[in-house]
């Protein structure tokens, strides 16, 4: 892990929407592709910053969705197709023609949409604790009810009390994670939920040729392991990696194990090398 590797933040206006963007630059010239990262619902950039710090030999770019973190509220609703287009334009702006794409939970759906919509610029795909959208196996009802409650972002005591129910296998660094969260606006959170209403990638995934790593937690209360197995069945060139005692936030609770799997997958020579256009 690099010492002092800090992101550069900027406010970028793309297609009439202003977004807070963060870019971590590689600490050394490695020739490795940048990572485009899509975060979970309601989660600001800082929520997953520790993971970006651990992958220090690649550029890493992510952004707050409208009304989330430091991005202003959306004026009108958006959908996954529109947001994938905005991500595509952001990569043009930051001169990243070919990337590896990664998404967690809600962001995993965005990562699928981006890969399906902009396949020519996606080298490899990593889907973490996510599903095929509308066609998913639901999680623990107790966790889903609490997840829908906006107090999980606004009230630290509520989050601390229900952390185990919400996220499963997270046993340490709970307070640290809670302190990194910034509550989304009500509009931002609602529009982010609305963006995926009725969305599913299932009919299209059998045509996705991108080399894909699917990572799931065996103790995930929100997106059960069965969803990862379904994705693995649908995507032709995929592999499934399971952290048996990992909850929904296993990227943080099992950081070393998770990062090792991610790095091994990304550094592995592709079956067919792809060159940036």
Task: List PLM regions with ranges.
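Active-site loop/oxyanion-hole signature of alpha/beta-hydrolase fold enzymes
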Residues: 62-102
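Short beta-strand/loop motif that positions the catalytic acidic residue
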Residues: 208, 214-216, 220
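Gly/Ala-rich beta-loop-alpha elbow adjacent to hydrolase catalytic centers
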Residues: 103, 107, 111
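Conserved alpha/beta-hydrolase catalytic His-Asp/Glu region
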Residues: 136, 156-206
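Conserved alpha/beta-hydrolase "acid-adjacent" motif
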Residues: 221-227
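Conserved HGGG/HGGXW glycine-rich cap/lid loop of the alpha/beta-hydrolase fold
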Residues: 17-70
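Flexible "cap/lid" loop of the alpha/beta hydrolase fold
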Residues: 112, 116, 123-152
């Amino acid at each position: 892990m690099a010492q002092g590797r800090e992101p550069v933040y900027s406010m970028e206006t793309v297609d009439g929407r202003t977004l807070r963007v963060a870019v971590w630059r590689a600490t050394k010239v490695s020739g490795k592709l940048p990572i485009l990262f899509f975060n979970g619902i309601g989660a600001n950039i800082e929520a997953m910053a520790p993971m970006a710090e651990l992958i220090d030999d690649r550029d890493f770019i992510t952004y707050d969705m409208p009304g989330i973190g430091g991005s202003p509220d959306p004026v009108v609703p958006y959908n996954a197709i529109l947001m994938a287009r905005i991500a595509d334009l952001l990569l043009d702006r930051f001169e990243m023609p070919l990337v590896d794409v990664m998404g967690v939970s809600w962001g995993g759906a965005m990562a699928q949409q981006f890969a399906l919509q902009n396949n020519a610029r996606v080298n490899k795909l990593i889907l973490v604790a996510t599903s095929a959208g509308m066609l998913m196996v639901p999680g623990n009802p107790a966790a889903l009810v609490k997840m829908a409650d906006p107090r999980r972002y606004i009230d630290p005591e509520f989050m601390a009390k229900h952390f185990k129910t919400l996220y499963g296998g997270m046993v340490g660094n709970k307070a640290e994670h809670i302190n990194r969260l910034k509550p989304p606006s009500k509009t931002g959170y609602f529009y982010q939920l609305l963006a995926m209403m009725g969305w599913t990638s299932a009919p299209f995934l059998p045509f996705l040729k991108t080399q894909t790593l699917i990572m799931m937690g065996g103790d995930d209360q929100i997106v059960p392991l069965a969803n990862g197995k379904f994705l693995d069945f649908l995507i032709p060139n995929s592999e499934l990696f399971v952290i048996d005692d990992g909850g929904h936030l296993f990227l943080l609770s099992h950081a070393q194990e998770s990062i090792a799997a991610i790095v091994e997958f990304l550094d592995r020579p592709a079956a067919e090398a792809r060159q940036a256009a």
